[in-house]
């Protein structure tokens, strides 16, 4: 089941679900999370819209007052990138909409190696993807 949501913490107990209330940065939005299990895992297929300088690991800053959430929907403004981001999901699909302040500087990080709690032995076994066109990416992740 898809649980599309932000990953604000990557290592340690506070990263168990990917999101921690005390955090003010978003590393990525990932498609799968465990909830209520007492242990962290998943955080599969990380996506982060960003702008500005290319970097290996862009990190978004956000303000709690600019978050909105309801079942199946999450929205937040990525302050340092000037991007309004909205997520929604069904059982098997996650959809992200990014509205960039600067329409000429649009970038999207797709990280198939992202995982929560790598220090607990969690790892990506393999992945592959291909760009079909300028709006479609298909692939596998395991």
What feature does the model see in each segment?
Residues 1-142:
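Accessory carbohydrate-recognition regions in carbohydrate-active enzymes
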């Amino acid at each position: 089941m898809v649980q599309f949501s932000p990953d604000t913490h990557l290592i340690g107990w506070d990263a168990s679900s990917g999101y921690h209330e005390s955090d003010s940065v978003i590393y990525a939005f990932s498609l799968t999370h465990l909830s209520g299990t007492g242990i962290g895992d998943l955080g599969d297929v990380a996506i982060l819209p960003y702008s500005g300088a290319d970097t290996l690991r862009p990190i978004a800053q956000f303000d709690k007052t600019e978050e909105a959430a309801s079942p199946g929907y999450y929205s937040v403004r990525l302050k340092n990138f000037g991007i309004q981001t909205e997520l929604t999901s069904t059982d098997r699909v996650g959809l992200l909409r990014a509205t960039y302040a600067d329409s000429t500087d649009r970038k999207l990080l797709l990280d198939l190696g992202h995982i929560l709690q790598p220090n607990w032995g969690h790892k990506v076994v393999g992945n592959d993807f291909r760009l079909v066109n300028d709006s479609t990416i298909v692939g596998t992740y395991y």
